[in-house]
Amino acid sequence: IDPMNILGIIMPEKESDPESELLGEEIAKQLEIQTQKIDITSILESFGVYEKKEKIVKEKFPDFDKNCKYRVAIPSKFSSSIGIPFLEILDDKGKTQKFKISTTEFLELTAASSIKHRVRMTMLYYYAEKNNFCVVGTTNKTEFLQGYFVKYGDGGTDIEPLTKLYKSQIYQIGKFLKIPQKIMKKNASPDVWSFKTSDEEFFYSVP
């Protein structure tokens, strides 16, 4: 495919990892792919995404402010702990604290976070239709088999070329394409929490 027929949409927001934006721009430049950056913070604010999540966070940690970061995680893989999700907060002094959350709180936190995926999908389709392009997904075989994608979010695509490939095979392709090591070694993440979270910390672990 001619790089001129590919458009990469970079969608930062106030809780996303700035490194993701930089790496996205770097790989697009290497592959000679044109990009467009749209900050979706104001859109998410209009849905009350941050307000909904921070309400629960502040109930657990009243001192929470803009200098703190937070995420929902599960016990480390293959530990003896029951896999019950918890809220983890990184305060402005670099100290982490964990808090129990109810099923209702967990569902509300993840539901609000899923809005981020769906806003991203909406923006992708706007630019796809505007340019007569199709939306390409990045779900791999492990994610597809486990259902690790958001319905009408990152699962809302026209084609999914990677669902026949395990992540190990995708790394082989990345090596063949000479993708920078800092991208290859970066933990896969949904990038919906202000406190960095990998797929394994948030959703699943496999041997």
What are these regions (language model features)?
Residues 137-207:
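Mid-to-C-terminal catalytic subdomains of enzymes
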Residues 1-139:
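ATP-dependent adenylation/nucleotidyltransferase module used to activate substrates
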